From Swiss-Prot:
Family: Belongs to the jacalin lectin family.
Short name of any one Pfam family annotated for the protein: Jacalin
Full protein name: Agglutinin alpha chain
Quaternary structure and partners: Tetramer of four alpha chains associated with two or four beta chains.
Length: 133
């Protein structure tokens, strides 16, 4: 896949992703907060099409992500992120994608998610997050 690194900002306002209900997560793009203003992050797109888009609009700054969870698994010989769920202090968004394979969950006990990095080829290969304490 093609690696991406959005860097760190001051918060998250919106997450735009796409998924296929038979394969995995495709595109991934975030609207961050940068010192009180929206900052539109780069759209990290799959090499292929056929995905359903989803827009997760957070009620920033009172709503923030407390946990990211999902599944990784094998699609066409690649281990990829098959499903994502975002739990905020107000509600749960998802799951989006295929909830089978190896589950993971990343609860944030202290701090805020302020950025994402990862890799996308046909699907989201992996991702990690920047935290601000």
């Amino acid at each position: 896949g093609k690696a991406f690194d959005d860097g760190a900002f001051t918060g998250i306002r919106e997450i735009n992703l796409s998924y296929n209900k038979e394969t995995a997560i495709g595109d991934f793009q975030v609207v961050y907060d940068l010192n009180g203003s929206p900052y539109v992050g780069q759209n990290h797109k799959s090499f292929i099409t056929g995905f359903t888009p989803v827009k997760i609009s957070l009620d920033f700054p009172s709503e923030y992500i407390m946990e990211v969870s999902g599944y990784t698994g094998n699609v066409s010989g690649y281990v990829v992120v098959r499903s994502l769920t975002f739990k905020t202090n107000k509600k749960t968004y998802g799951p989006y994608g295929v909830t089978s394979g190896t589950p993971f969950n990343l609860p944030i006990e202290n701090g805020l998610i302020v950025g994402f990095k990862g890799s996308i080829g046909y699907w989201l290969d992996y991702f990690s997050m920047y935290l601000s304490l």
